[in-house]
Design a protein with these regions (language model features):
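Conserved Class I S-adenosyl-L-methionine
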Residues: 2-18, 25, 29-30, 34-37, ...
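Conserved alpha-helix/loop element of class I SAM-dependent methyltransferases that forms part
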Residues: 32-54, 69
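Short glycine-dipeptide loop
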Residues: 52-53, 76-77, 148-154
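Class I SAM-dependent methyltransferase SAM/SAH-binding core
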Residues: 55-115, 139
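Conserved hydrophobic residues forming the short capping helix/wall of the S-adenosyl-L-methionine
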Residues: 74, 97, 175-176, 204, ...
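A short acidic, Gly/Pro-enriched loop at the edge of an enzyme's catalytic core
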Residues: 113-124
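A short SAM/SAH-binding and catalytic strip from SAM-dependent methyltransferases
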Residues: 123-137, 160
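Conserved catalytic/acceptor-binding region of the Class I
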Residues: 138-139, 145, 149-224
Length: 286
């Protein structure tokens, strides 16, 4: 069901601009992200049933995950089509694929709802924290289902609730309190928009998928200091930077300082942070 809280065209345009801007940060932090999120990519590929020779679609692939993981599993007889709304993120994905020596990937710039492939084009589909950003997640899932062969599986990821995802919850809750921003209405797309098994499983069910299953996975992210954590968030997380953007620079600076202090509450004696984050993985059959 398309979100009633945002204008879809406006929202997707803002997403494109924000993620194009964030691509520089993803280049800088990709190793940190890969180390933490790699297990999610591997499990999604497994849940989707990707095997040698598989034809795979990755929706909202960003910088190329889980596309690259899937491409390695599909092998030279398989293929992966990685799609994303951001040209800059895809450009980095192409570079990463080339550096990994993977020649079985194709990158296409498109939002999820506009994808168009013939029926039975793919054996499996994936989306790691991607389709949850679409204003019409169920509609996008239905389109993906139409591209899959009968019985093909679509495996997707979302984040849990803010208190179980400190990487996002700490900065987002701090910023919203500091700036007196009310919680977004239910159905507003974003990283924390599908925080329960019912919500993320419902996206697939709403898209017509059957035999939907949901599981949890814990992903740990390490930072040498609270300051480094704040820098990380500023450079890779458009949903949070967008909260601050409308405010004067001094207010933004004060809010980032408050985020650093909130993060410091999670620090160990040496000042470093180890944040365990709950992700939800869902899979359904076409």
């Amino acid at each position: 069901m398309e979100s009633k809280t945002v204008d879809p065209t406006e929202f997707r345009g803002a997403q494109r601009e924000q993620w194009d801007t964030a691509a520089t940060g993803w280049r800088k932090w990709s190793e940190v992200i890969d180390q933490a999120a790699g297990p999610a990519s591997e499990r999604l590929v497994e849940l989707a049933g990707v095997e040698p020779g598989s034809r795979v679609l990755d929706v909202a692939a960003g910088y190329g995950e889980p596309s690259l993981t899937a491409a390695k599993q599909a092998g030279e007889d398989g293929s992966v089509v990685a799609t994303d709304i951001s040209a800059e993120m895809l450009a980095y994905g192409r570079e990463r694929a080339a550096a990994a020596g993977l020649e079985n990937l194709e990158f296409i710039e498109s939002d999820a709802i506009s994808l168009d492939f013939p029926e039975d084009s793919f054996d499996a589909a994936l989306s790691r924290w991607g389709i949850i950003f679409d204003p019409d997640g169920e509609g996008a899932a239905a389109r993906v289902r139409g591209f899959l062969k009968p019985g093909g599986r679509f495996a997707i990821a979302s984040w849990g609730p803010p208190d179980k995802v400190p990487m996002l919850g700490v900065p987002m809750v701090t910023a919203m309190k500091r700036l007196d921003i009310p919680p977004p209405p239910p159905g507003t797309p974003g990283p924390l928009s599908r925080p329960t098994p019912e919500a993320i499983g419902g996206l697939l069910q709403g898209g017509g998928f059957s035999d939907v299953k949901v599981e949890e996975i814990a992903l740990t992210m390490d930072y040498p200091s609270a300051e480094e954590f704040t820098t990380f968030v500023r450079e890779i997380a458009p949903p949070i930077t967008a909260l601050l953007a409308p405010h004067p620079q001094d207010v933004q600076d004060e809010t980032w300082a408050a985020i650093t202090e909130a993060a410091r509450e999670h620090a160990s004696e040496d000042g470093s942070l180890r944040l365990e984050n709950q992700a939800l993985l869902a899979v359904g059959k076409a």
